[in-house]
UniProtKB/Swiss-Prot annotation:
This is Chitin synthase. Its EC number is 2.4.1.16. It is a multi-pass membrane protein. InterPro entries: Chitin_synth (IPR004835), Chitin_synth_fun (IPR004834), Chitin_synth_N (IPR013616), Nucleotide-diphossugar_trans (IPR029044). Residues 16-37 are annotated as: Disordered. It comes from the Eukaryota. Belongs to the chitin synthase family. CDD domains: Chitin_synth_C. Pfam families: Chitin_synth_1, Chitin_synth_1N. Its main location: membrane. Keywords: Cell membrane, Cell wall biogenesis/degradation, Glycosyltransferase, Membrane, Transferase, Transmembrane, Transmembrane helix.
């Protein structure tokens, strides 16, 4: 009953904000036990103390840990002489040396150590009997120094333990002397024991399996977490953490955190089978919740039932808990213990801020070897985390790895989900596999990836992590519009900084077998929000990486590796250039194919389709300038998606008809043609030669990897494809940078009216200055967005008009087509689709003016050729070979 009253008093005190220092048994910093010595060392120390009692200096007794730092004892020399102790001692006589040597031999035999070397001591002293006493003393001392190394090493170790213990006592005394407002309030709550509902938890003798420890954290800067005296229970138990996993969450439901923790618990069980049953002590999980008011009620209820959270206190928690998994009503199965740190932030700061706490506060204290990033809702397979860690253990040059992210239970009747399923599969099969061969993966997804902590950790404030968190440590005005957009894809910045780290040669790797299933946006509005953020951030991050290519000269990569990186980044530059004109290429594809089909048969329908298409593009520009994608604008986005999808499927059908249909081979101008689809049929011969194998590249690559499910989502992907290439996604701005302010209570006057008024005036002046600065920054971002959209629209229009009225298309397109064939060795999703669109535009334009093209392509097909499968890395490379006209 007294414990319950004590607990209630503590909870009430913490809620009122005036928590008193914890009781001695639950104090923040408990004095460490004195070092334990070996029994023989203890016996030797006792004898030495008794024999040298009058000659050794005495030390002042150690003060208690609750004293101030100035009260920490200092060893003082009480002997009033400037000479050393050895010089003050008389020289022993030879007979006494012999007696001392015999004593050493007997002592050595008693502690069961080899005494062969000690048997030489009496003999050496007998030989020196006729010599002077100092010579005998010197000989004996030399033998003692050379023969007692084992005992000396043990004594040295004991001395180191003693020094560590004294430093700990001094640190505890310093922390105990902190002002009352800085003392750490910590409370143990039997939530874990209550979660077992009367059953005895495993390892119930340890407090970490019975009690949850709550700590109210007042640190504003996460890097000062350890310096302010906060200690995680895992660190207090002196456990060396090898794998540190973070789960970032916002407002997800309890079922999502349940799935993620269950997947990690299964993975921990598998790692315990591989590394040993006690490996769970080297694994810890940190759950960082972004905002107390944003946390889901069902998620908090689940954590409360698990024993990782208590509704009464909103703090950072640290515990060790066994995760039960009830399989049926007759028995229960228990996973290995999972050490969980649940951090609930008071304010919403974003996912990047959650990573800031994980790396700069928790990881900096625990110093793990590997860190794993997981989003809540992502469910790793049983062996996924193990495979990520094993790949870095086998190759010490790998600094980061990424697994395969798959859609959890894709709904093929929902085109939004099915299109993302197809895109994820193709990206994993083609993009990441090939980038892994080069050693640089453009982005390691934050939903499921792992880093070697040594590779990204900052050294004296310099390293990948400070650049990764630059958008949090800098104001929006300091970043500017370019960097503000660039840090929408901070994952890409971290990968580039890891690759180009000075005097290092870190690489990245893709692990195909490490699969994690995640939930994807299910509505069109959510998909557009995600696409805007990803496309915008990747575009500006790509420009940043290309512009800072010279920093590779400071890394320690080999010359051949740097040449490969240069080639890869040159390709990325070309990809960014082509993606700039992606919208105009899509329009030209629709324009030429529809013109070939409907110029003579239905000119009014053709004019209406093209006019409506341009009107939709103009509407998207207006929405991009003024409104965010919200449910109120969902109807317009839905209409544009459906219309562009229908146009895409129509163009695809016309292209397939041109491949399999029968018709004349005559080439005529579509403006004077008679008969629908006549000109399209004229392309049959050239299209069938190149487009058929090109169409099978994606499917053949998928079949090599055993991904047969893409057949069920390919139609939905082509239907949604125009939605992914809306250039209005550019210049979205920044992701919550304007809301990054300092939190905490504000100070007021001491109670006098005059002081209160002055304080309020200062606060009002600060608010006005901050509001004016924010308005100026917003205006600069709006101007940047409007200017960029205007430039993009002008470039798209200019390219479309030039290609429509061009009569020398061989000069314009035959040169780039050779470059396309060269760079098509590297298969990329965005570039491949763009090249397909541009190739069909060239095919249609050449058919109108000059006849069949030299290298025709289809709008719905991607370049192909020989397929080279590298089984070691599971990378598929599409090699495109030009086909010359007969």
């Amino acid at each position: 009953m007294s414990d319950q009253l004590d607990l209630a008093a503590r909870l009430r005190a913490l809620r009122e904000g005036n928590a008193a220092p914890a009781d001695p048994e639950t104090a923040t910093h408990t004095a460490w036990p004195a070092p334990q010595y070996h029994p023989h060392c203890r016996r030797c120390i006792h004898k030495s103390r008794s024999s040298w009692e009058g000659r050794m200096p005495r030390a002042a007794p150690c003060a208690e840990a609750e004293g101030s730092y100035s009260q920490v004892p200092v060893w003082k020399d009480s002997k009033e002489t400037r000479r050393s102790y050895l010089d003050d001692e008389p020289t022993p006589q030879p007979q006494s040396l012999i007696n001392m040597a015999n004593t050493l031999v007997q002592r050595q035999r008693r502690i069961n150590l080899p005494a062969a070397a000690y048997s030489e001591l009496p003999t050496a002293a007998q030989h020196r009997r006729g010599a002077s006493g100092r010579q005998a003393n010197t000989a004996t001392q030399v033998l003692q120094l050379t023969c007692t190394w084992t005992l000396a090493r043990r004594s040295s170790k004991s001395a180191e333990e003693l020094g560590t213990w004294m430093n700990t006592v001094a640190e505890e005394a310093r922390k105990a002397a902190l002002p009352p407002q800085l003392k750490i309030a910590r409370t143990n709550v039997p939530t874990v024991e209550q979660a077992w509902k009367g059953r005895t938890p495993p390892f119930h003798d340890a407090d970490e399996f019975r009690l949850m420890r709550y700590t109210a954290v007042a640190t504003k800067d996460p890097i000062q977490f350890s310096n302010d005296g906060y200690v995680l229970r895992v660190h207090q138990l002196h456990r060396r953490i090898k794998v540190f996993i973070t789960i970032t969450m916002y407002n997800e439901e309890g079922s999502e955190i349940l799935g993620t923790l269950t997947g990690l618990a299964k993975g921990l069980g598998y790692m315990c089978k591989e590394y040993g049953q006690d490996f769970w002590q080297e694994v810890a999980v940190a759950i960082v919740s972004d905002g107390r008011t944003k946390a889901s009620k069902t998620c908090l209820e689940y954590l409360n039932g698990l024993g990782a959270f208590d509704e009464e206190i909103m703090t950072v928690t640290s515990l060790g808990v066994d995760t039960p998994a009830g399989e049926n009503q007759t028995f229960e199965n228990y996973f290995p213990p999972l050490q969980v740190i649940y951090a609930l932030k008071e304010n919403n700061g974003g996912k990047l801020n959650s990573h800031l706490w994980f790396f700069n506060a928790f990881s900096e204290q625990l110093n793990p070897k590997y860190t794993v990033l997981v989003d809540v809702g992502t469910i790793p397979a049983e062996t996924s985390v193990f495979r990520l860690i094993r790949s870095m253990e086998r190759n010490y040059q790998i600094g980061g790895v990424a697994g395969e992210i798959a859609v959890e239970a894709p709904n093929y009747f929902n085109p939004v989900i099915a299109a993302q399923h197809f895109e994820y599969k193709i990206s994993n099969i083609m993009d990441k596999s090939l980038e892994s061969v080069f050693g640089f993966i453009s982005v390691l997804p934050g939903a499921f990836s792992a880093y070697r902590y040594e590779a990204i950790r900052a050294v004296k404030g310099v390293g990948p992590l400070p650049e990764y968190f630059k958008s949090l440590t800098s104001t929006t005005k300091e970043l500017g519009p370019f960097q503000g957009n660039m840090y929408l894809a901070e994952d890409r910045i971290l990968c580039f900084e890891l690759l180009a780290r000075k005097h290092k040669q870190w690489t990245m790797h893709y692990v195909k077998d490490a699969i994690a299933r995640t939930d994807v946006p299910e509505t069109l509005v959510d998909l557009i929000k995600q696409a805007r953020r990803w496309l915008n951030g990747s575009f500006f991050a790509g420009l940043f990486a290309i512009g800072t290519l010279a920093v590779w000269s400071q890394s320690s990569h080999t010359m051949s590796r740097k040449l490969v990186f240069t080639f890869q980044f040159f390709y990325l530059a070309l990809q960014n250039l082509l993606s700039w004109f992606l919208l105009s290429n899509l329009f030209l594809t629709f324009y030429f194919v529809l013109t070939l089909a409907f110029t003579d048969s239905a000119p009014a329908l053709l004019q209406a389709m093209l006019t409506l298409y341009l009107a939709i593009v103009g509407g998207l520009i207006v929405f991009a300038l003024g409104n965010k994608p919200e449910p109120r604008t969902a109807s317009f986005y839905l209409f544009s998606c459906l219309y562009m999808g229908i146009i895409m499927m129509l163009v695809t059908g016309i292209s397939i008809y041109g491949l399999v249909g029968k018709g004349t081979s005559a080439v005529k101008d579509p403006r004077v043609i008679t008969g629908p689809l006549a000109t399209v049929l004229s392309l049959k011969g050239s299209l069938s030669v190149v487009s058929s194998p090109r169409l099978g590249l994606i499917f053949l690559s998928a079949f090599v990897h055993g991904e047969f499910s893409i057949l069920l989502s390919v139609i939905q992907y082509f239907f949604m494809l125009p939605t992914f290439v809306q250039f209005a996604h550019l210049s979205w701005g920044t992701k919550g940078l304007e809301s990054g302010g300092r939190h905490g209570p504000t100070k007021t006057g001491g109670g006098k009216v005059k002081e209160v008024v002055e304080q309020q005036k200062k606060l009002e002046a600060q608010r006005q200055a901050a509001a004016k600065e924010k308005e100026d920054v917003d205006n600069s971002f709006r101007a940047f967005r409007s200017t960029l959209l205007a430039v993009v629209a002008h470039d798209q229009r200019h390219l479309a008009l030039r290609c429509d009225g061009l009569h020398v298309e061989r000069v314009l397109l035959e040169g780039p087509q050779l470059v396309v064939g060269f760079f098509n060795v590297i298969v990329s999703r965005a570039a491949l689709y763009l090249l397909s669109c541009a190739s069909l535009s060239y095919s249609a334009l050449t058919a109108v003016q000059w006849g069949p093209p030299t290298i025709p392509m289809s709008a719905t097909c991607r370049p192909t050729g020989r397929l080279i499968t590298m089984y070691r890395t599971k990378a598929t490379v599409g090699l495109w070979l030009p086909v010359q006209r007969a």
